[in-house]
Amino acid sequence: MSKNISTTPPVSCTLCPRRCGADRAAGQTGFCGAGGTLKAARAALHFWEEPCISGTRGSGTVFFSGCTLKCCFCQNYPISAEGLGKEITIEHLAGIFLGLQEQGAHNINLVTPGQWRPWIIAALDIARAEGLRLPIVCNTGGYETVESVEAWRGYIDIWLADLKYVSSSLSAELSSAPDYFAQARPAIEAMMAQAGHPVFDSEGILQKGVILRHLALPGHIDDSFAVLDQMAAWNEADPGCFIPSVMSQYTPFYKAAEHGIGRRITTYEYRRVVNHAMDLGLTAGYMQQKSSAREEYTPSFDLTGV
């Protein structure tokens, strides 16, 4: 499905909810850190997503540089906040997608792609013309506009989205986004409307649908309860419209200690979050083990594959 998307860098960028207006065509970088040339930091088979994404052969994951959020605890901070990455062409990116397919990937997994959407869509058009047939995953922090979700229509099969916060003060403190929930809620609703209910293949690998993640943070389980309440409301309105994934893997990376979250979540805290999810009927999904909070689950951003 081609939309004849221009890859000319925007002169007043509005690709994300910040609508910062950066003249990326003139070399300015936006709030996200992205400029006028596509940039990625890693492309490889990834085995640490939810089982229906990683499967047995891995998810063909491409980590893009920059991010529209500024999470003080980001485990990917070298690429999201510090600009690590390699400038590449859309033709090269198309080749990366095809190479991951040849390696046996179950899907193509685009990590924080929003600030590069026009470039990625152009690369997907090229790759599809050359035989790309895998489901495409948009791995997003949830801070999107409804317009952005709609712009991905026909390209994204699976939305792997976070719902990080409900509290505007907490999202302002930890991610520099006081409007996080106000933007994420309608965007996620648009994702669910677009993708439909989850569909799996014969191997149990997701082919279309939404996985909605929440990472429990130390000292903030009340906000986790509020997030889960919102998830439950969606599930009650349309049972099975997404797959919930509650995560315990929080590790205090980057500037976490400066914002009062310089420790891992306790077993007691996480058990309370899981129990709340279960009480709300959010049982048809994933509940991560506490042992997942280990630094070795973070990939090395050494420009592998790009």
Where are the language model's segments positioned?
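Auxiliary Fe-S-binding modules of radical SAM enzymes
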Residues: M1-T29, H197-V306
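N-terminal [4Fe-4S]-dependent radical SAM core
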Residues: M1-T68, C72, N76-A81, F301-L303
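Short Fe-S-cluster ligation motifs
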Residues: A40-T61, G95-P113, G285-M287
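Short, conserved acidic/polar surface loops in the N-terminal third of protein domains
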Residues: C72-N76, E82-E87, I120-A123, S148-V149
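Conserved alpha-helical substructure of the radical SAM core
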Residues: P78-N107, H276
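Flexible, glycine- and charge-enriched loops at secondary-structure boundaries
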Residues: K86-I90, A177, F181, R263-T267
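Positions that flank functional sites
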Residues: T89, Q115-W116, S292-A293
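Conserved AdoMet/S-adenosylmethionine-binding subsite of the radical SAM
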Residues: G95-H259
